From Swiss-Prot:
Highest taxon listed in the record's lineage: Viruses
Enzyme class: transferase
PANTHER family per the UniProt record, alphabetical: THYMIDINE KINASE, THYMIDINE KINASE, CYTOSOLIC
Signal peptide: none
Organism phylogeny: Viruses, Varidnaviria, Bamfordvirae, Nucleocytoviricota, Pokkesviricetes
Gene3D superfamilies: 3.30.60.20, P-loop containing nucleotide triphosphate hydrolases
E.C. number: 2.7.1.21
Family to which the UniProt record says this protein belongs: Belongs to the thymidine kinase family.
An example Gene Ontology molecular-function term: metal ion binding
Coiled coil: none
Binding site for substrate: 113, 157-161
GO biological process terms held by the UniProt record: DNA biosynthetic process; thymidine metabolic process
Catalytic activity: thymidine + ATP = dTMP + ADP + H(+)
Name the UniProt record assigns to this protein: Thymidine kinase
Amino acid sequence: MNGGHIQLIIGPMFSGKSTELIRRVRRYQIAQYKCVTIKYSNDNRYGTGLWTHDKNNFEALEATKLCDVLEAITDFSVIGIDEGQFFPDIVEFCERMANEGKIVIVAALDGTFQRKPFNNILDLIPLSEMVVKLTAVCMKCFKEASFSKRLGTETKIEIIGGIDMYQSVCRKCYIDS
């Protein structure tokens, strides 16, 4: 075995996916692995680099397609990817990198604000050695939240935003609103 594998961190908005991604990458850095993180370049809510909703920043390459950063990451053994659901080539990229012996850690939404699947992320599940689904806290009733709900009437899937545009909600609060 070459040691390459895929770790997938999924869940709704505000569940700590990016924070967990950063935590895992930092663990590998402490162990002297060469690490790189990649963020979706259209996500510029807080500035350059990878940002958590609580304003923690981590250095990251930016791309809209992962194949565009292949040359830049050849010397790294750990690759962290944030907002994985937005990369059209996420499945092929992760499988290739893991097969080449790299550790790939992906943080992504598993469902849209309409509770429809991000199919590219679901396609990663059978290819991943580790899958963790995080929950958030329902912003209406304060129970466990597994879903993201968009505020407003916009129906386009790729609308990048934070607490101003989305809430994490439980099943009951999703259905009731």
